[in-house]
Amino acid sequence: MHFEKLKEMEYQDKTNEQRTIRVLMSGGGTGGHIFPAVAIANEIKSRFPNAEFLFVGANGKMEMEKVPQAGFRIEGLNIAGFDRGNLLKNIGLPFKIISSLWKARKIIKNFKPDFAVGTGGFASGPALYVASSLGVPIFVQEQNSILGKTNQFLGRRAKAVFMGYPNISSFLPAVFTGNPIRENIVTDIINTKEAKEKMGLDPNKLTILSVGGSLGSKTLNNAWREFLPKLKEKNIQLVWQTGKLEYQNIISQCGSDEQGIQIKEFISDMALAYSAANVIVSRAGAIAISELAVVGKPILLVPFPYAAEDHQTKNAMALVEKNAAKMVKDSEMNEKFWNTLMEICEDENLRKEMSSNLKFFAKPNAAKEIVDEIFKILKTK
């Protein structure tokens, strides 16, 4: 039924503005799962303004707040992941899974989607499994360089698995599209010197941008506490995003902004900050790397070592193997961090080579490519 309806759409006299399709979206738990789902939905909506969307999330998780803020309807399942740290918390998990499957079945039968897209997270497992069981075509988007457990399971049922990285097992219908990123990262990047001037920095001095996410990175923050005096001696500028948890402590310890050193709790205009940087230090989350690849600045990655299946290290290694980035482990945030950073800062040819190699991973139109593939696949079935 779903394929036939989409094939009919190709030949109807109606314009896209008049057509109505129903799309089930599921992804959440972290921003890295939520943002791609919203970006894909927005791309579909730009082509089919009358399209109806329903997101399925996990109750109590951030998608229940973020998705409505993005303008989409969402229903929640009482589902959670397996807790490796406290096994007793998993006693009720089988009952939650069964309950979620039943609720997902009810949601999908009522909504009657034409197809479903999952971007990972607790709720996408039951939502897309049930959709597939009911004959709804499903598509999976994987942000990391390795498939998460949920997407491994769903990938075998999917019409396509859209990969953020090119290296994925051949037994799945994988398509390398890259990860959807914020549109302004593509459109608002400006000349480096101009960006430095806008940020009140010396346009002629090399500038490092350090980003650790909205909560910040304790590892990166501790490193800058240690190496800030050496950085000043080198006459290198630093834009240091601390995150909200440690901002006040860092300000009291290191002082407020001084010439060439900007300490910020949060950076609202990331496109401007990226533009101003000559070198970027970052964790190795999938969406962060996708943005950095499009920005094309030399990067030093410090993977978060406790990410599921150590996927941040695998993300970073995908770039390191192409000489598109340097990596320092969390346990190596000592002189090795400093020496690696200075190797990048003091070698202009190396910086140019890293920037050039990053282009292999840059996919500024990932959401468009994903939606193109979805409709190409549906119309040929």
Locations of regions flagged by a protein language model:
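A short, well-ordered alpha-helix in the C-terminal region of glycosyltransferases
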Residues: 350-364
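Active-site-proximal region of nucleotide-activated glycan assembly enzymes
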Residues: 22, 52, 62, 73, ...
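An amphipathic, basic-hydrophobic alpha-helix
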Residues: 86-115
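Donor-nucleotide binding loops and adjacent catalytic segments primarily
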Residues: 61-62, 66, 70, 190-280, ...
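C-terminal alpha-helical cap of glycosyltransferases
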Residues: 2-3, 10, 364-381
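Acidic donor-binding loop of glycosyltransferase active sites
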Residues: 113-115, 275-290, 297-298
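N-terminal subdomain of nucleotide-sugar transferases
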Residues: 2-57
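Conserved nucleotide-sugar phosphate-binding/catalytic loop shared by glycosyltransferases and other
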Residues: 21-28, 47-95, 212, 246, ...
